Amino acid sequence: MALVSADSRIAELLTELHQLIKQTQEERSRSEHNLVNIQKTHERMQTENKISPYYRTKLRGLYTTAKTDAEAECNILRKALDKIAEIKSLLEERRIAAKIAGLYNDSEPPRKTMRRGVLMTLLQQSAMTLPLWIGKPGDKPPPLCGAIPASGDYVAKPGDKVAARVKAVEGDEQWILAEVVSYSHATNKYEVDDIDEEGKERHTLSRRRIIPLPQWKANPETDPEALFQKEQLVLALYPQTTCFYRALIHTPPQRPQDDYSVLFEDTSYADGYSPPLNVAQRYVVACKEPKKK
């Protein structure tokens, strides 16, 4: 029943999103005339080689209108982004509900483990579709935007992806990509599933063994302080794996769509680090351990 109500709400939101996209285009078309007027006024001023009181007054009015138009378009786009975020949240809730229903449905045969190539593609898609944080003028990026860690009292929700420190088969410890199943306030412990085992490998871990992954990409052009900087020590997901390893930032992203370039610690190389490899913002988190000498 919950899945049906989620589906109907998603359909409503998609309709609302479509209307907002149409409004954006209408607003843009409406403001186009004013922008053309600004350009023509500047051309006339250059031709006459002077700024008369008439042109000064006219431009002030045109720019005031342009600013109002831009703010109106911006407000519509923000509403559209909110709709997209709500749709993604509902889709995630639906996925978790379906997963739980599958776990407790004894009448169905067990699902086959996802092929590794499919899993890697899904991880790449998750990184690409991570929303870019777009604040209003003067806003500071929130926790879990880029390199900004979660607040001290933050509790990751079921379905959230995290870096989790677990014991490997050999007894060593490693950081894996995991999905939160639940959190107990009584014990202050998480239950998480190894993402590579699709729920077959479940771990109960204390808070200090969990690092929530970023929920927004940081924009290097507007919020560079929300990114890890060159030579900063991090944990990064090694390409084509589901494990995090220590690495140094080689180059931070320069544009919103760029990845980090990182140097993984690797004793097989003379200087102790691998050649530069690209890792998406989604899969780079702070490393609290000291840097190796």
Curated annotation (Swiss-Prot):
GO molecular function list: histone H3K36me3 reader activity; methylated histone binding; methylation-dependent protein binding
Record keywords, A-Z: Acetylation, Chromatin regulator, Coiled coil, Nucleus, Transcription, Transcription regulation
Record bears the keyword Metal-binding: no
Region (Histone H3K4me3 binding), start-end ranges: 264-266
Gene Ontology cellular component terms for the protein in this record: ATAC complex; mitotic spindle; nucleus; SAGA complex; SAGA-type complex
Histone H3K4me3 binding, annotated site positions: 238, 245
Pfam families in the record: SGF29_Tudor
Biological process annotations from GO: negative regulation of transcription by RNA polymerase II; positive regulation of DNA-templated transcription; regulation of cell cycle; regulation of cell division; regulation of DNA repair; regulation of DNA-templated transcription; regulation of embryonic development; regulation of RNA splicing
Highest taxon in the source lineage: Eukaryota
Start and end residues of each SGF29 C-terminal domain: 152-293
Entry text on domains: The SGF29 C-terminal (also named tudor-like) domain mediates binding to methylated 'Lys-4' of histone H3 (H3K4me).
Role according to the record: Chromatin reader component of some histone acetyltransferase (HAT) SAGA-type complexes like the TFTC-HAT, ATAC or STAGA complexes. SGF29 specifically recognizes and binds methylated 'Lys-4' of histone H3 (H3K4me), with a preference for trimethylated form (H3K4me3). In the SAGA-type complexes, SGF29 is required to recruit complexes to H3K4me. Involved in the response to endoplasmic reticulum (ER) stress by recruiting the SAGA complex to H3K4me, thereby promoting histone H3 acetylation and cell survival.
Subunit structure comment from the entry: Interacts with dimethylated and trimethylated 'Lys-4' of histone H3 (H3K4me2 and H3K4me3), with a preference for the trimethylated form (H3K4me3). Component of some SAGA-type complexes. Component of the ADA2A-containing complex (ATAC), composed of KAT14, KAT2A, TADA2L, TADA3L, ZZ3, MBIP, WDR5, YEATS2, CCDC101 and DR1. Interacts with (methylated) CGAS. Interacts with TADA3L, GCN5L2, SUPT3H and MYC.
Homology family: Belongs to the SGF29 family.
Protein name in the entry: SAGA-associated factor 29
